Amino acid sequence: MGIRTVAVYSDVDFRSLHVEASDEAVHIGPPAAADSYLCKEKLIEAALSRGCQAIHPGYGFLSENHEFARMVVQAGLVFIGPSAEAIAQLGDKIAAKALAISVGAPVVPGHHQSLSGVEEAVATAEKIGYPLLLKPASGGGGRGMRIVYSQSEIEDAFTSSQTETTKAFADNRMFMERYIPRPRHIEIQIMADKHGNVVHFPERECSIQRRYQKIVEESPSLAINEPIRRTMGELACRLARKAGYTGAGTVEFITDENKNFYFLEMNTRLQVEHPVSEMVTSLDLVEWQLRIAAGEPLPLMQSEINAHGWAMEARICAEDPRRGFLPTVGMITRYATPRGKGVRVDSGVRAGSVVTIYYDSLLAKVITHGENREEARERLVQSLNGFHLEGLITNVDFVNAVVNHRHFVAGDISTNFVEENFPNGQPVDEPALEKHHYMAIAAILIYHVRKGLVVESLKPMAAKIGRRPPAPTATEYVLKGEGCLFNVRLEGDQASRTWKIAVDDTSYYVETPEFEFYRRRLKLKINGRYQMFRSRYQEQHIQIFFCGLI
């Protein structure tokens, strides 16, 4: 679009990709976000010092901060987003519920007014019935939310929820509504210009979450039919018009197991998962944001926005699923992203990047597109298999396991999916014996070939002309896995790359590629079908992760 950009950076981000990609960059302060990226005055000062005309708030906290939006406009700059008034109204969940009701949107039954204290909370809970959900009027990300199953829990839940909310958002207002078991999370992307035009895009499903934060998204959704899809889109546009909204926004709904849907909230910004919508429409939503902010009308009307195919996105985060998804830190020592038809990677890091304690754990997004859901899913699996990151623990293998899970493949998902199928970050379903055998084969081959290379390197050099190659011999191993032992008998050699391997009493015929140990990825052809594995060397152990059929 020919727009020059100015980036801001903190002390620890002076070598970041966003700094390198911008035309200019301004140092904004120390690592702590409150003293740099969230400091409103410093951001505005940086913009004015470089002669900027507008500020794009990204999709962080300031993108939904009405005070910041107001300060930007007062400084004579354009805020690329809705007005401060719209942000204030829709950012208040109680006010947003009232607005949604006024345009005819269904809401979850409950008490959509601020609770005065514990006594009112107890009395109101009796009227609504259990289980119920306590929610803060401000904020997001699941902070302050509590599921309450009985009267004995309500007092402690209200007190702890209000305390957390006050600390996080400086707002102690709480409300409550009926808890919807196993809901699905559906959202509608809207765009509104300054001329009264509003359009909606195909829905996105964001039901795969951990700690109320999304990790896998897709569009369209299997959860809704065409009439519901159309109604959701119309209600989202109606809500935006009522609020005098401009720019990009997302209206969120939940559906219950009977396919009833309810308004949840509206996010007054562009979502992290917006590439999913871009992949199914071939439209650039950030470009739309910029054109709207410049006063242009919407590039397309509703009838001109068409969806094709299916898209999925997986968020790659620096976190440890086995430790409650705690953030991890460190330097990225190896980094390679997948490529291919229908594959897009939005990344903020590279080899040498240092992941610190100061910012969000999101490192990259892998987005795939296919003619149908299964093709998009298969491309996502292949892309995750080809996503290579070392130096710190990430959730790559976890999200790969999620999209390979039989319930995900079948579309049987809800916001409880991770909790039900991956408690403590590990699958409930025990892998089939065949998969255990596959992992045993991968581990033994890695060990056997590495050992053979070492032995060969220690032999004296000798002419091989006129000598017959030695006949392949069988080698037997006992492999110790997690809580089990495998007797493995291996015949073959790396020269032919073909092996006959018996795991306990089951035989497999295996073809191997040229081993490239530095890649940590291994593709084996087992009984005629390709399987993908990832390896990790830890002290005297080889860890094998099964990444699925390819």
Segments (PLM) and residue ranges:
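A conserved acidic, glycine/proline-rich C-terminal tail/linker
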Residues: D505-Q531
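N-terminal beta-alpha lobe that positions the nucleotide/phosphoryl donor
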Residues: M1-V251, T255-H274
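Structured core elements
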Residues: V6, H27, H56, L133, ...
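Structured, non-catalytic alpha/beta "coupling" segments that mediate domain-domain communication
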Residues: A54, E64-M71, R323, I526-I550
